[in-house]
Amino acid sequence: MATESSPLTTHVLDTASGLPAQGLCLRLSRLEAPCQQWMELRTSYTNLDGRCPGLLTPSQIKPGTYKLFFDTERYWKERGQESFYPYVEVVFTITKETQKFHVPLLLSPWSYTTYRGS
């Protein structure tokens, strides 16, 4: 049975170790009108490769403002590491639901980088 590929993906790399960030908890939310409140769509964890497949199905995606919340404090504490950022929030806008969106996160205890990937 074929599975639908998610139009939204993320990949988290632990740049301190040079390895994928396995087991990092993340939450996906969408900003809902008219109250402008975040509605949580999914909570998940990165897999062995630092990826989180199936964040959204093609039927779930719609134009709007989305947020990926990464629980970096818990991730680093589980590794016995102090960190500066307790969490990372990446807020982005989807204008065309027919496109694919990839949100990589490069993570260390003292910094992070994100960008729109392909």
Swiss-Prot record:
InterPro entries to which the protein is assigned, alphabetical: Hydroxyisourate_hydrolase (IPR014306), Transthyretin/HIU_hydrolase (IPR000895), Transthyretin/HIU_hydrolase_d (IPR023416), Transthyretin/HIU_hydrolase_sf (IPR036817), Transthyretin_CS (IPR023419)
The keyword Hydrolase appears for this protein: yes
PROSITE patterns on file: TRANSTHYRETIN_2
Catalytic activity: 5-hydroxyisourate + H2O = 5-hydroxy-2-oxo-4-ureido-2,5-dihydro-1H-imidazole-5-carboxylate + H(+)
EC code(s) of this entry: 3.5.2.17
GO terms, molecular function: hydrolase activity; hydroxyisourate hydrolase activity
A GO CC term assigned to this protein in UniProt: peroxisome
Recorded metabolic or biological pathway in which this protein acts: Purine metabolism; urate degradation; (S)-allantoin from urate: step 2/3
Homology family: Belongs to the transthyretin family. 5-hydroxyisourate hydrolase subfamily.
Protein name: 5-hydroxyisourate hydrolase
Organism: Mus musculus
Lineage: Eukaryota, Metazoa, Chordata, Craniata, Vertebrata
Gene name, Swiss-Prot/TrEMBL: Urah
